[in-house]
From Swiss-Prot:
Family statement: Belongs to the NusB family.
Molecular function GO labels: RNA binding
Keywords: RNA-binding, Transcription, Transcription antitermination, Transcription regulation
Function: Involved in transcription antitermination. Required for transcription of ribosomal RNA (rRNA) genes. Binds specifically to the boxA antiterminator sequence of the ribosomal RNA (rrn) operons.
GO CC field: cytosol
Protein name: Transcription antitermination protein NusB
GO BP annotation list: DNA-templated transcription termination; transcription antitermination
Domain of life according to the entry: Bacteria
SUPFAM superfamilies for the chain: NusB-like (SSF48013)
Length: 165
């Protein structure tokens, strides 16, 4: 089974970019961009719908994280592509429990290399995401399961309960 996650991320980025330039809704913009293969794959569509929903529903919160970590930049001055790559990656970090943080960050960097207009964009995206990820981790706001991230606290509790007293 082929995975379409990179393609989906790219299509969502294109839809987010379209939203910045036109008066349309995100679902229409994104659905118009999807390939037939993605539309016919239930797992791909599940990921597409989840990521799109989380970006849309949590955009204000996500933008606050970005604004806090781009001290020298007003949100309006950040390149549209970079800003939307950050939004997409943060939606994954915060709300897609089965995607490891490193995958979300690496995908964002690779997409920045492909779509951004300067070589510095991927470094900018990496630096901002790394800082936000460290903050989220310190605050205990990263909740991953399955393949996403091992819950070390649960393992520690399990080992402690197995230790004879």
């Amino acid at each position: 089974m082929k995975t379409y996650r990179r393609q989906i991320r790219e299509k969502i980025l294109q839809a987010l970019y379209t939203l910045e330039l036109r008066d349309t809704d995100i679902e229409s913009a994104a659905n118009w961009l999807l390939t037939k293969e993605i539309q016919e794959d239930p797992n791909a569509m599940k990921f597409f719908n989840l990521l799109l929903k989380n970006i849309k529903e949590h955009r204000e919160e996500i933008d606050q994280y970005i604004a806090r970590h781009t001290f020298n930049w007003d949100m309006s001055r950040i390149a549209i592509i970079d800003k939307n790559i950050l939004r997409m990656a943060l939606a994954e970090l915060l709300y897609c429990e089965d995607i490891p943080p490193k995958v979300s960050i690496n995908e964002a960097i690779e997409i920045a290399k492909k779509f951004s207009s300067t070589d510095k964009s991927s470094k900018f995206v990496n630096g901002i995401l790394d800082a936000i990820f460290n903050e989220l981790k310190a605050e205990g706001k990263i909740h991953k399961n399955g393949r996403g991230l091992i819950d070390h606290s649960a393992i520690k509790l399990q080992k402690e309960s197995e230790t004879p007293e």
